[in-house]
């Protein structure tokens, strides 16, 4: 786990989500020192933002595909 201010550009949604889940478990279980927990929290925020970005990109791509396939705009509310 890297605690840099940026996230690796090539990390997949699934990898980011898995790491985020692991961070949440460690923080919830109190398995880390305060300093490590704060660093993990910071990393978790980066991972959350990355996952949200990937989901938004996927939603936009689906909307574009739907528009092209039907030649009409079909926007449906998607739950995240």
Swiss-Prot record:
InterPro entries assigned: Exonuc_VII_S, Exonuc_VII_ssu_sf
Protein's GO biological process: DNA catabolic process
Gene Ontology terms, MF aspect: exodeoxyribonuclease VII activity
Gene Ontology, cellular component aspect: cytosol; exodeoxyribonuclease VII complex
Keyword field: Cytoplasm, Exonuclease, Hydrolase, Nuclease
E.C. numbers: 3.1.11.6
Annotated compartments: Cytoplasm
Catalytic activity: Exonucleolytic cleavage in either 5'- to 3'- or 3'- to 5'-direction to yield nucleoside 5'-phosphates
Pfam families: Exonuc_VII_S
NCBIfam families hit by this protein: PRK00977.1-3, PRK00977.1-4, xseB
Subunit structure: Heterooligomer composed of large and small subunits.
Cited function: Bidirectionally degrades single-stranded DNA into large acid-insoluble oligonucleotides, which are then degraded further into small acid-soluble oligonucleotides.
Family affiliation: Belongs to the XseB family.
Name of the protein this chain belongs to: Exodeoxyribonuclease 7 small subunit
Native source species: Rickettsia rickettsii (strain Sheila Smith)
Lineage, highest ranks first: Bacteria, Pseudomonadati, Pseudomonadota, Alphaproteobacteria, Rickettsiales
